Amino acid sequence: MAATTAAAAVPGVVRAERLLRGGCVVMAATAALLLGFSAETKTVLFVRKTAVAKDVQALWVLTVAAAAAAGYQFAQLVRCMYCSSSGDAGAMAVAWTSFLLDKGCAYVVFASTAAALQACMVGLIGVEALQWSKLCNIYTRFCEQAAAGMLCSFLAAAGMAVLSAFSARRLFRLYSPAGHRRSCPRAAVLATSPH
């Protein structure tokens, strides 16, 4: 009875992982597109200036990190669909690689989002001690697009943190005796044979 409920739970976990990876692809790609293509041109004191993501280094890093994370999550989504249909999801090297890359991806996206948020707060409220003026009063549309991009990347980072928990669960189940028997038919035969 317990084996049938465990077997029935696995497709639900795989389905949840697929949905979450798909959501992370969409959120990270949306963040990269919003940040990468946001630009606004204004004339201030007879000088025409265009605000783009490259003007704030942290926004540019977030744009690149979100684009890379979207590509990685898409590759993992394809791997998840392929491995669940072929039954090769129990490979130890694949589990370790997925675990480490999922963790790294979540950390990089979260850290770059936090850095971009901190840098953009200067543009939002200014710093009078350093005589940095508020820029979001001038470049309103650019700031709104940057805020939407950072919100999408924060949601993607939260989803990636949950996905790293899925990867950790899959990896550490390979080290449990019950999980090892399910993923390795030879071990199941050796465990049931008399010594």
Curated annotation (Swiss-Prot):
Protein location: Cell membrane
Cytoplasmic side: 1-18, 79-106, 167-195
Disulfide bonds: none
Residue intervals passing through the bilayer: 19-39, 58-78, 107-127, 146-166
Record InterPro entries: CASP/CASPL (IPR006459), CASP_dom (IPR006702)
Membrane topology: Multi-pass membrane protein
PANTHER family: CASP-LIKE PROTEIN 2C1-RELATED, CASP-LIKE PROTEIN 4A4
Name of the protein described by the UniProt record: CASP-like protein 2C2
Organism, scientific name: Oryza sativa subsp. japonica (Rice)
